[in-house]
UniProtKB/Swiss-Prot annotation:
Coiled coil: none
Domain of life, source organism: Eukaryota
Protein name from the UniProt record: JNK1/MAPK8-associated membrane protein
Lineage: Eukaryota, Metazoa, Chordata, Craniata, Vertebrata
Miscellaneous comment in the UniProt entry for this protein: Elevated expression in medulloblastomas. Patients with cancer had 2 to 12-fold higher frequencies of antibodies against this antigen.
Originating species: Homo sapiens
Length: 311
């Protein structure tokens, strides 16, 4: 195969784009930014992203997809109150919105029309922040080579959040207006108003910290799920197994946290160590059991009552 010989490209992410190919002859352009859907290889040539996402990539996308859903459920529960019977319908609607947004996002991504995406493999943290690695050969002129080296893991999250927001604005107000009769006019839409705040926050979080989240999300899941489970059981004054079994809602919350524990463990293990670390899944119920066995020594109900009385 004949390839035109040109000087090597500067910078980590500058590459040469294929201009012409005729049989075994390939002609590449000057060093610059790679087109969307391509990234540089070791020889500094822009190559299309043709690989399938790894299991860890899918788990990361699943984590980013869960964030708005969990926040929806939290604010729905927060603003619905104990007297409202509309919370369940709103929970189901939020799940439907996020599920449909995920399906639509996959369908509009390359290749279009199938529930499959092609991607470039993440090699290091700097792949998420190519804008920080634009070379300046003479320390005056900057060669701009910013592109999505982790295609499409960075932008697909923004697309998903956009569809989540659109579907929420189309479906949720009609549902809330029709069934949330137990709430006041000023309260029934507060969960929607909350989403209008946390979606921009999630967008900025992905834009600035997407690479950090990619490597840290398994540990974030484990820590947050442990903390929130302890806080929930303490606030609900659960001190023994009977308190846990007396209400179905508490069991649902417990099993949801167990699923998050398992999700975090599998994410940390990755696919290359999954078989070795599968026995760790047996530890999923351990935090809840530890809490139940030690609750009698801390007496969460007494602590809550003293806090409410200002002591």
């Amino acid at each position: 195969m004949a390839v035109d010989i040109q000087p090597a490209c500067l910078g980590l992410y500058c590459g040469k784009t294929l201009l012409f190919k005729n049989g075994s002859t390939e002609i590449y352009g000057e060093c610059g930014v790679c087109p969307r859907g391509q990234r540089t290889n070791a020889q500094k040539y822009c190559q299309p992203c043709t690989e399938s996402p790894e299991l860890y990539d899918w788990l990361y996308l699943g984590f980013m997809a869960m964030l708005p859903l969990v926040l929806h459920w939290f604010f729905i529960e927060w603003y619905s109150g104990k007297k409202s019977s509309s919370a369940l319908f709103q929970h189901i609607t939020a799940l439907f919105e996020c599920s449909m947004a995920a399906i639509i996002t996959l369908l509009v991504s390359d290749p279009v029309g199938v529930l499959y995406i092609r991607s470039c493999r993440v090699l290091m943290l700097s792949d998420w922040y190519t804008m920080l690695y634009n070379p300046s050969p003479d320390y005056v002129t900057t060669v701009h080579c910013t592109h999505e080296a982790v295609y499409p893991l960075y932008t697909i999250v923004f697309i998903y959040y956009a569809f989540c927001l659109v579907l929420m604005m189309l479906l949720r107000p009609l549902l809330v207006k029709k069934i949330a009769c137990g709430l006041g006019k000023s309260d029934r839409f507060k969960s929607i108003y909350a989403a209008l705040y946390f979606f921009p926050i999630l967008t900025v979080l992905q834009a600035v910290g997407g690479g950090l989240l990619y490597y840290a999300f398994p540990y974030i899941i484990l820590v947050l799920s442990l903390v929130t489970l302890a806080v929930y059981m303490s606030a609900s004054e659960i001190e023994n197994c009977y308190d846990l079994l007396v209400r179905k809602k508490r069991l649902i919350v417990l099993f949801s946290h167990w699923l998050l524990h398992a999700y975090g463990i599998i994410s940390i293990s990755r696919v290359d160590k999954l078989e070795q670390d599968l026995p760790l899944l047996a530890l999923v119920p351990t935090p809840a059991l530890f809490y139940l066995f030690t609750a009698k020594f801390t007496e969460p109900s007494r602590i809550l009552s003293e806090g409410a009385n200002g002591h």
